[in-house]
């Protein structure tokens, strides 16, 4: 019987170590999706590729009635690293992954020399950054932390 007890303790210790290793590995990188959207007060076009965020766009950008996806990028960013996303305006968005804090992903967001901030987002959430002009529309960035 002592052998079974030792085996159980060894199995539990192995499971704990594997769980901690998986948690650490999950903390090493984050997947990000950036969608560039042209928003305009003219027309009523709504791009079906934006159906998953339609209500949030209409609520958050109620002055606009037309939303068209122009570009979409997926990148995985390693901890303490940055990734560049070229925008349709020619500007470059830089996102930095600064690790996790509790249930949040810590990100740095920089739009060349115009804007720089840090934020916390929950995995699976989408946040927006808007203000650049694109082809007589406002460029809205929908940034999803996957």
Where are these regions (language model features)?
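Bacterial N-terminal signal peptides that target proteins for export
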Residues: 1-11
């Amino acid at each position: 019987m002592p052998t079974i007890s030792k085996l159980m303790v060894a199995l539990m210790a192995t499971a704990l170590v594997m769980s901690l290793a998986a948690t650490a590995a999950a903390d090493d990188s984050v997947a990000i999706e950036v969608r560039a959207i042209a928003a305009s007060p003219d027309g009523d076009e709504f791009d079906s590729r934006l159906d998953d965020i339609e209500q949030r766009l209409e609520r958050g950008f109620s002055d606009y009635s037309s939303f068209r996806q122009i570009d979409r990028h997926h990148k995985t960013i390693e901890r303490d690293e940055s990734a560049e996303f070229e925008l349709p305006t020619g500007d470059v968005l830089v996102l930095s992954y600064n690790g996790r804090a509790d249930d949040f992903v810590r990100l740095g967001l920089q739009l060349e020399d115009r804007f720089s901030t840090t934020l916390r987002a929950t995995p699976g959430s989408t946040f927006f950054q808007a203000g650049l002009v694109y082809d007589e529309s406002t460029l809205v960035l929908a940034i999803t932390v996957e």
